[in-house]
């Protein structure tokens, strides 16, 4: 019996060491957080094939639970944050085979309002891999830290009394020893100590659904995000307010992650024009200038992607219309056909765009300044696909209603 236990211990230790080592491997192909390595919707390490296959090859498919957090990929492991039997669940799978490495869950009761019933009870925020750990925000706002190699729950902050109407959707971001997020509908933007969960600073501004970014402007590292009433910026180091710009979306539905273009920040939300802001510091004070506004396009939940000087995405207007906008001037370069999709998740790779519609159609298109140029269309699931895909190398990880699947080009 002792020998059997020793063998089990050794096998478990080897598995944990293997998972830990995987975290340090293949970093060029890691997709470790919301919208990828740089939070800009870029794929990691994709190489365009000489000829596109007629169909993608599904390598594996695993039931992981509900929710539409993006799967993240680190080394040889893919992580999924989902809901299973009333619990929010963090699952680690072997990226090559789909085999379970570990699974950790905690009770997370949540009642879905009727308007969001079709989307389920979440979770919606994408996990963050940072410093060897995983950080999650549950649909009710519970903040959790897990050891990425073992799944051990390191610390957890319980859900606040109130959360956004449609549940938490803003994904956490990491910087050095901080994890930063909006913990709830009326919670301030908050920086937690990544190791202990202690609050390091909190900045005013009720949370919306958009995820924050970190950018350096005027020599100052700052966090830019959307609140329910403003576009705001605070210093990463201490949360000190830097600048803000009034911004009122329909309801509180600001769900689009800001995009950095040169010295400007491009922001958008439901029934609002796509807008480029230029924050500058003059005589010690920040001034925010509107560089351009584009009223031809409005963005609801589909985050766009920037390729060179062109912004591509899906407008909510005309019941879903692909577009290209000149990021320098805000001029509309082209608008696609109406009713192309009700929602799409956009990932860029070189001059290519991967557009995963919510009906499980994956469109590969060329980032053109003259019009919509589809290259191939693939079906990648048997149910709705609200989660953004993770593209790591030439692997496409797709989360549908309850399953996670790996698709490859051959």
Regions found by a protein language model. Give the residues of each.
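Hydrophobic helical h-region of N-terminal Sec-dependent signal peptides
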Residues: 10-21
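Bacterial N-terminal signal peptides that target proteins for export
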Residues: 1-12
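Noncatalytic, solvent-exposed loop/strand surfaces
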Residues: 22-410
């Amino acid at each position: 019996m002792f020998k059997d236990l020793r063998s089990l211990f050794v096998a478990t230790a080897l598995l944990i060491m293997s998972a830990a080592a995987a975290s340090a491997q293949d970093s060029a192909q890691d997709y470790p957080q919301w919208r990828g390595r740089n939070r800009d919707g870029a794929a990691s390490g994709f190489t365009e094939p000489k000829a596109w296959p007629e169909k993608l090859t599904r390598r594996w498919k695993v039931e992981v639970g509900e929710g539409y957090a993006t799967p993240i990929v680190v080394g040889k492991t893919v992580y999924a944050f989902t809901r299973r039997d009333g619990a929010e669940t963090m699952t680690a799978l072997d990226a090559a085979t789909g085999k379970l490495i570990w699974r950790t869950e905690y009770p997370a009761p949540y009642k879905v309002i009727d308007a969001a019933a079709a989307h389920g009870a979440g979770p919606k925020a994408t996990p963050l891999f940072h410093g060897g750990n995983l950080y999650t925000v549950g649909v009710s706002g519970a903040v959790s830290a897990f050891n990425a190699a073992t799944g051990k729950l390191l610390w957890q902050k319980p859900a606040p009394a109130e959360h956004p109407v449609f549940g938490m959707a803003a994904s956490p971001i990491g910087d050095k020893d901080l994890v930063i997020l909006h913990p709830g509908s009326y919670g301030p933007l908050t920086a937690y100590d990544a190791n202990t969960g202690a609050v390091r600073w909190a900045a005013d501004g009720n949370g919306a659904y958009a995820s924050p970014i970190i950018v350096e402007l005027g020599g100052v590292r700052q966090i830019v995000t959307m609140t329910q009433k403003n576009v705001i910026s605070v210093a990463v180091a201490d949360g000190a307010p830097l600048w803000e710009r009034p911004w009122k979306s329909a309801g509180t539905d600001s769900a689009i992650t800001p995009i950095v273009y040169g010295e400007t920040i491009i922001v958008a939300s439901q029934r609002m024009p796509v807008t480029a802001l230029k924050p500058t510091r003059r005589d010690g004070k920040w001034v925010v200038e509107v560089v351009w506004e584009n009223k031809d396009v409005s963005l609801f939940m589909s985050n766009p992607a920037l390729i060179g000087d062109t912004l591509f995405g899906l407008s909510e207007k005309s019941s879903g219309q692909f577009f290209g906008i000149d990021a320098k001037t805000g001029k509309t370069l082209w608008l696609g056909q109406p009713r192309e999709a009700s929602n799409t998740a956009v990932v860029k790779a070189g001059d290519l765009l991967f557009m995963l519609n919510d009906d499980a159609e994956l469109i590969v298109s060329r980032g053109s300044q003259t019009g919509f140029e589809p290259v191939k269309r693939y079906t990648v699931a048997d149910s709705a696909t609200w989660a953004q895909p993770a593209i790591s190398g030439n692997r496409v990880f797709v989360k549908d209603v309850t399953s996670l699947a790996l698709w490859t080009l051959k």
